[in-house]
Amino acid sequence: MYIYWILLGLAVATEITGTLSMKWASVSEGNGGFILMLVMISLSYIFLSFAVKKIALGVAYALWEGIGILFITLFSVLLFDESLSLMKIAGLTTLVAGIVLIKSGTRKARKPELEVNHGAV
């Protein structure tokens, strides 16, 4: 089961890298940023598609998008001098609270009980 969480972590990391490279490509010369963006976003979806085999889709998607938005915002402030207003901080705090609620409200699926088949004689 841990491998699926690792895959989800890789999906998040590649999404963050891909999205940040999109911004980098828009402010720099050349096509390197766009190529990196294409590769990273593609990998992100591939990793996510494997992760949802064992992780609930709602949880996986909330973590993928939510953690991605959180880190993309923080890295945008650090790397691209974007502003971080009080409203953005409130939004990020609400986002984290929502992720925690979604994760904590998810139950593990029960294993199906074995059916005893009493064939007619």
From Swiss-Prot:
One of the protein's GO biological processes: glycine betaine transport
Main location class: membrane
Keyword Repeat appears in the UniProt entry: no
Subcellular location: Cell inner membrane
Alphabetized Pfam families for the sequence: Multi_Drug_Res
UniProt-recorded Gene Ontology molecular function terms: amino-acid betaine transmembrane transporter activity; antiporter activity; choline transmembrane transporter activity; spermidine transmembrane transporter activity
Keywords: Cell inner membrane, Cell membrane, Membrane, Transmembrane, Transmembrane helix, Transport
Residue numbers on the Cytoplasmic membrane side: 1, 53-54, 103-121
One Gene Ontology cellular component: plasma membrane
Subunit structure: Forms a complex with MdtI.
Protein name: Spermidine export protein MdtJ
Source organism of the structure: Escherichia coli O6:H1 (strain CFT073 / ATCC 700928 / UPEC)
